[in-house]
């Protein structure tokens, strides 16, 4: 179908009023630390997303994504931009499908929170609302499922040492930590008592 949205891109919207970036602060920072260019810079917001706020930045012909935690209080470990940057600034070397993160900042005076800037990759998330041209075709759905599995196998085949990520994380006790963490998040966020969840 026809492209809609900002810059002819259906993923992009005008920045929401309450989620607007202060471009007057971040633009000089990006020019000094990443772009090294005085080409025109434009900003928009990605309309989708599930938690973190994601913004589009174009400088000349180059496209980037700025990611920051959501507004309001967040659990310290659930939106760790520094960790996300650390992983994505290295993982692409052993897993070329990963977008490369170029820049991390913990200077909250720039946009109100820590953030990182990564390359933009075009595509779509595998969710129940697949693009219309991929719905209902059993063969296409099977091929997508196989591609997802193959991609996960390739990701899990990356040797952490080879991409300088061997000191990341604590693999021992992962499942117990996840269960404990999600239980705490549930208790912090619930507004209805559902005994079956406890």
Regions picked out by a protein language model, each given a short descriptive name:
Residues 4-37, 41:
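Juxta-kinase regulatory segment immediately upstream of eukaryotic protein kinase catalytic domains
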Residues 38-198:
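ATP-binding pocket architecture of kinase catalytic cores
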């Amino acid at each position: 179908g026809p492209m809609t949205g900002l810059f002819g891109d259906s993923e992009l919207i005008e920045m929401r009023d309450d989620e607007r970036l202060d471009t007057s602060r971040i633009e000089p920072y990006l020019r000094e630390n990443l772009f090294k260019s005085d080409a025109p810079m434009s900003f928009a917001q990605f309309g989708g997303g599930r938690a973190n706020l994601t913004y589009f930045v174009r400088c000349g012909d180059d496209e980037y994504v700025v990611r920051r935690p959501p507004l309001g209080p967040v659990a310290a470990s659930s939106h760790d931009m520094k960790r996300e940057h650390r992983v994505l600034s290295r993982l692409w070397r052993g897993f070329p499908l990963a977008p490369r993160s170029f820049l991390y900042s913990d200077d909250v005076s720039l946009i109100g929170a820590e953030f990182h800037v990564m390359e933009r990759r075009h595509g779509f998330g595998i969710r129940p609302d697949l693009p219309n041209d991929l719905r209902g075709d059993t063969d296409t759905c099977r091929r997508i499922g196989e591609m997802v599995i193959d991609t996960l196998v390739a990701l899990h085949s990356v040797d952490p040492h080879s991409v300088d990520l061997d000191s990341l994380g604590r693999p021992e006790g992962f499942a117990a930590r996840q269960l404990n963490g999600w239980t705490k998040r549930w208790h912090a966020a619930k507004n209805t008592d559902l005994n079956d969840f406890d």
